[in-house]
């Protein structure tokens, strides 16, 4: 790999690892990121594993620093199951998205573009095409072609031609049992790429309407990525609506077949706890106490990962960033699109600023706001009404 030289001075760096295994490559890269004074502000590592990884704390590193990172990762992997999991580390500057399940299926659900790819040998040409869809021009890759017991892979003699036909350029001097290179197709990418590839928008100005849990969490996420965010709310203070209840319980949904709703809520509960642990005071604003759910039939179910939390405290913590400005006691009545920017207006028609992106997080109020805006925006209100 050509890291950390390649990421020097960058705002963010995304790595795709299709063979996460025991997480050792992630631990090595995380450690390199911590030590590098020119590291990117954000490191996003997407790892795909067929089963929940098992981290061997003692064998993962020869020193205390490495073992400390391994212990943190091992603790975050406890009680994880199939599906997608977002794990925040280093004050949320390092994001690990762990995808547990069939590698090809998981890869097909991704929509980002990676700067670096760490790959196992692909099973067929379709797998190579999935890798290409996760690339942008210049993305670097490193592929381990070591034969894996029981794995179905493309024969090593066919891989170079297959990769080149898909747009990859190969380095002439790769190590034994490995291929490396970059994605640099001869054709124009925008006209040959499916619309599922989302290009990250350059950080700019964003307006968010609504300062509850939804709006504050989006504001916090955008601010971490370098955006300047203004949050508007009709209440005087953030969390003035339902998000301002004195305390609440965060408990995952449970189903007999562990359906997507259950998996999503379980991952969401774990992610909420990570934010709370980083931003709030245990015992005062929240507590990972676990929750006992009493069933109507008289039974009970213990949720070890559940917690109680004061939502308003979390909202305030999310908004406490120099990149975020809160504007209260302000109603947004209309949106207007012009010159690729959005202008917000209050009920008196006063211009409240122009923004590259607007996020509506004002619950049922968004329908009325869309209807009161221009024709193109009103169409979105009609679509919303059908949901």
PLM features: what roles do these ranges have?
Residues 328-343:
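A conserved short coil-to-beta-strand element within the FAD-binding core of flavoproteins
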Residues 247-303:
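Dinucleotide-binding Rossmann-like beta1-alpha1 core, especially the glycine-rich loop
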């Amino acid at each position: 790999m050509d890291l950390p030289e390649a990421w020097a001075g960058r705002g963010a760096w995304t790595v795709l690892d299709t063979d996460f295994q025991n997480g050792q490559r992630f631990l090595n890269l995380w450690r390199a990121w911590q030590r590098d004074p020119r590291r990117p502000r954000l490191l996003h590592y997407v790892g795909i594993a067929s089963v929940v990884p098992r981290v061997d704390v003692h064998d993962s590193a020869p020193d205390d620093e490495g073992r400390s990172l391994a212990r943190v990762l091992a603790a975050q992997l406890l009680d994880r199951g199939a599906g997608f999991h977002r794990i925040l580390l280093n004050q949320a500057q390092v994001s690990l998205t762990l995808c547990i399940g069939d590698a090809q299926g998981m890869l097909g659900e991704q929509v980002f573009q990676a700067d670096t790819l760490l790959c196992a040998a692909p099973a067929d040409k379709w797998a190579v095409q999935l890798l290409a869809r996760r690339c942008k021009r210049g993305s670097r890759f490193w592929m381990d072609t070591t034969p894996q017991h029981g794995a179905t892979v493309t024969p090593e003699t066919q891989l170079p031609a297959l990769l080149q036909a898909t747009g990859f350029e190969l380095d002439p001097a790769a190590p034994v049992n490995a291929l490396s290179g970059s994605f640099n197709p001869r054709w124009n990418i925008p006209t040959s790429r499916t619309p599922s590839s989302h290009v990250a928008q350059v950080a700019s100005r964003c307006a968010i309407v609504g300062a509850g849990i939804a709006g504050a969490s989006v504001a916090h996420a955008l601010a971490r990525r370098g955006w300047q965010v203004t949050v508007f709310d009709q209440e005087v203070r953030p969390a003035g609506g339902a998000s301002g209840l004195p305390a609440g319980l965060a408990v995952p949904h449970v189903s007999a077949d562990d359906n997507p709703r259950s998996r999503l809520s379980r991952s969401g509960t774990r992610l909420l706890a990570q934010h709370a642990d980083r931003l709030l005071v245990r015992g005062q604003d929240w507590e990972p106490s676990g929750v006992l759910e009493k069933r109507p039939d008289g039974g009970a179910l213990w949720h070890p990962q559940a917690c109680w939390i004061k939502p308003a405290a979390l909202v305030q913590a999310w908004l406490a960033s120099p990149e975020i400005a809160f504007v209260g006691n302000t109603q947004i009545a209309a949106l207007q699109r012009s010159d690729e920017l959005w202008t917000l207006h209050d009920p008196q028609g006063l211009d409240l600023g122009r923004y590259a992106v607007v996020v509506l997080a004002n619950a049922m109020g968004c329908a009325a706001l869309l209807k009161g805006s221009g024709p193109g925006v009103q169409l979105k209100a009609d679509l919303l009404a059908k949901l």
